[in-house]
Amino acid sequence: MDNEFTRSMWNYPFKLTYRLILREKELHFNIGVYNPSKDHTFSFNLLLHTYFKVPDVRRCQITGLHGCTFIDKTRDNQIFQEGRDVVTVCEWTDRIYQNTQPEHIITNVVSGRKMRVQKYNFPDTVVWNPWQEKARDIPDFGDDEFPNMICVESGHVSSPVILLPGTAFEASQILQV
């Protein structure tokens, strides 16, 4: 909502809609941002912080990232190319994968199931786990919780969305078990 409070943090008129649809085995996320200004362009980044509960993060596999370049935030933002067919996490991980596939499969999610992540207009995918050393630094994160979670986050983070006056941006994500 565009109001005095939001203007104190970000001085642009805007309209944001966020719609969630829950179905039996699916969760849909739809987000829209509209720039009602007649004169001003603005830019922003967007990331859906999706935390998945897993039995053991070391046994999870993520598809749809092979061949993508990624920014490794654990290694001074160096850029690498992903050579693995499936990505696994066995250490502190904070990566921004760029120009990723519109679908990822995450294996060994809750009860050993697969989670399908389908995304539209989110070119980036962040894979994150704080591991033991970083989990201690997060106040609302238990020191022993890192093995039971993984973040696979759809976003528009490596380059901003630029909204010209009177234009809109829409993106969506569907999670399926």
Describe these PLM feature segments:
Residues 108-150:
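Glycine-rich active-site loops that engage anionic ligands at enzyme catalytic sites
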Residues 65-84, 131-132, 139-161:
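Surface-exposed, gly/pro-biased binding rims or lids
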Residues 31, 162-177:
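Short Pro-Gly-centered flexible turn/kink motifs
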Residues 9-12, 21, 158-168:
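Exposed beta-sheet edge/beta-hairpin loop segments within beta-rich domains
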Residues 1-24:
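Extended, loop-rich substrate-binding clefts of extracytoplasmic carbohydrate-active enzymes
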Residues 16-18, 29, 46-48, 150, ...:
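Hydrophobic residues positioned within well-ordered beta-strands of beta-sheet architectures
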